[in-house]
């Protein structure tokens, strides 16, 4: 750290490199925080978490009991040991509570005054955060597995919705109706995700073993159907274009939007080039996945080499995205983990499990990593994740 600070002060290093190196060090030191609890409100499993991107202070959780809870993650007590309190909740006694399991919650990307939730009760609800009242409700004919709003959209207010049916539905928050439908999958849609780079690009994952990329402005079908074999095993058959050998039940773009990660019930995770759909063939080994519905995993942001955090049974596996190396397994839950979310401001991770608990994982402050200029090679040998994979083109593109 001191070496980086001196180099930055002397103008020998880009300040961004210091920030990325420190972010990387903190992610590599993640451990269960023994001084911080998240108030336990859910009486059954926690299915979904989301931290608002404006301040990074408030977190939503949705449970199998249909309950939605809003937490304040800030330590206002200034004490070393504290509990992240629930600010408010949509409990079982609330008149507008979801009847069945809440599968996805998401903050409105530009303002904490609104959030959305979807459930097995076949509804997508839009909430006013301040009053905890419903602003709008979208009703569907099928169970809702997943929904997502674009984090970068300025020209549309579309919410992509994946249901038990094979069609992806796009709901317009401005008009309050489903604007159009994307057809191409053959079975239920288990996960949907908008690109953080291009506002009209959408990724979808289905139980038909396929993952697709769409430009929602086009009426002629999907842009790309991801093929794990990169077209080498079969030149013609559409049936050959499968992303996994089982259900594809999880999607996540990298923070720059240049790549897409998918997970499937074949116990594999794959990394794809999001511009041409090419399988990069990064080998992550076995990534255990027995989820019958969507698996919500997340990626880091602002590190020298980015990381992916994947629920792995009752643990969370941490991999470097571009090398496939497994860094660690975060152990603390008693039952299967269904979701996790990364807080990029402080490099913290929050996870939700079927044991009804939400755990906080924070950087360990005990161990320091050598950062002297003379010890750069030693640092690289300690962990290849410290090697700076950033280039200016990533930021400019």
UniProtKB/Swiss-Prot annotation:
WD repeats lie at residues 41-81, 97-137, 184-224, 243-282, 332-371. One of its GO terms (biological process) is single strand break repair. GO terms for molecular function: ubiquitin-like ligase-substrate adaptor activity. Gene3D superfamilies: YVTN repeat-like/Quinoprotein amine dehydrogenase (2.130.10.10). SMART domains: WD40. It holds the Pfam family WD40. It comes from the Eukaryota. This is DNA excision repair protein ERCC-8. It comes from Bos taurus (Bovine). Pathway: Protein modification; protein ubiquitination. Substrate-recognition component of the CSA complex, a DCX (DDB1-CUL4-X-box) E3 ubiquitin-protein ligase complex, involved in transcription-coupled nucleotide excision repair (TC-NER), a process during which RNA polymerase II-blocking lesions are rapidly removed from the transcribed strand of active genes. Following recruitment to lesion-stalled RNA polymerase II (Pol II), the CSA complex mediates ubiquitination of Pol II subunit POLR2A/RPB1 at 'Lys-1268', a critical TC-NER checkpoint, governing RNA Pol II stability and initiating DNA damage excision by TFIIH recruitment. Residues 370-397 are annotated as: Disordered. Part of the CSA complex (also named DCX(ERCC8) complex), a DCX E3 ubiquitin-protein ligase complex containing ERCC8, RBX1, DDB1 and CUL4A; the CSA complex interacts with RNA polymerase II; upon UV irradiation it interacts with the COP9 signalosome and preferentially with the hyperphosphorylated form of RNA polymerase II. Interacts with ERCC6/CSB (via CIM motif); promoting recruitment to lesion-stalled RNA polymerase II (Pol II). Interacts with KIAA1530/UVSSA. Interacts with a subunit of RNA polymerase II TFIIH. Keywords: Chromosome, DNA damage, DNA repair, Nucleus, Phosphoprotein, Repeat, Ubl conjugation pathway, WD repeat. GO terms for cellular component: Cul4-RING E3 ubiquitin ligase complex; Cul4A-RING E3 ubiquitin ligase complex; nuclear matrix; nucleotide-excision repair complex; nucleus; protein-containing complex; site of DNA damage. The modification Phosphoserine is found at residues 391-393. The keyword Transferase does not apply. It is found in: Nucleus; Chromosome; Nucleus matrix.
């Amino acid at each position: 750290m001191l070496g980086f600070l001196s180099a930055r002060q002397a103008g020998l290093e880009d300040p961004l490199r210091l920030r990325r190196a420190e972010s990387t060090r903190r992610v590599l030191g993640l451990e269960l925080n023994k001084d911080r609890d998240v108030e336990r409100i859910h009486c059954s499993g926690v299915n979904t978490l989301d931290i608002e991107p404006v301040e990074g202070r408030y977190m939503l959780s949705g449970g199998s009991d249909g309950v939605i809870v809003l937490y304040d993650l800030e330590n206002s007590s200034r004490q070393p040991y504290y509990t992240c309190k629930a600010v408010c909740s949509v409990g079982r006694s609330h008149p507008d509570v979801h009847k069945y399991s809440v599968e996805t919650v998401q903050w409105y990307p530009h303002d904490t005054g609104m959030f959305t939730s979807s459930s097995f009760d076949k509804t997508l609800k839009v909430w006013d955060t301040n009053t905890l009242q419903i602003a709008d409700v979208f009703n569907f004919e099928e169970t809702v597995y997943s929904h997502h709003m674009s984090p970068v959209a300025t020209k549309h207010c579309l919410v992509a919705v994946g249901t038990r049916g094979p069609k992806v539905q796009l709901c317009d928050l401005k008009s309050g109706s489903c604007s159009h439908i994307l057809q191409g999958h053959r079975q239920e849609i288990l996960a949907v995700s908008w690109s953080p780079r291009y506002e009209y690009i959408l990724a979808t994952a289905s139980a038909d073993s396929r993952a697709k990329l769409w430009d929602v402005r086009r009426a002629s079908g999907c842009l790309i159907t991801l093929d794990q074999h990169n077209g080498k095993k079969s030149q013609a058959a559409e049936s050959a274009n499968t992303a996994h050998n089982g259900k594809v039940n999880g999607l996540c773009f990298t923070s720059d939007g240049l790549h897409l990660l998918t997970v499937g019930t074949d116990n594999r995770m794959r990394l794809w080039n999001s511009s041409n759909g090419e399988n990069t063939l990064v080998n992550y080994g076995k990534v255990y996945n027995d989820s019958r519905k969507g698996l919500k995993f997340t990626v880091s942001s602002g590190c020298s080499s980015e990381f992916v955090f994947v629920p792995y049974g009752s643990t969370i596996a941490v991999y470097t995205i571009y090398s496939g190396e497994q860094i660690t397994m975060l152990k603390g839950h008693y039952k299967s983990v269904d979701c996790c979310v990364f807080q990029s401001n402080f490099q913290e991770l929050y996870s939700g499990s079927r044991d009804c608990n939400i755990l906080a994982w924070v950087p360990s402050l005990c161990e320091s990593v050598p950062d002297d200029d003379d010890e750069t090679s030693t640092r690289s040998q300690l962990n290849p994740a410290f090697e700076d994979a950033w280039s200016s083109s990533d930021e400019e593109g």
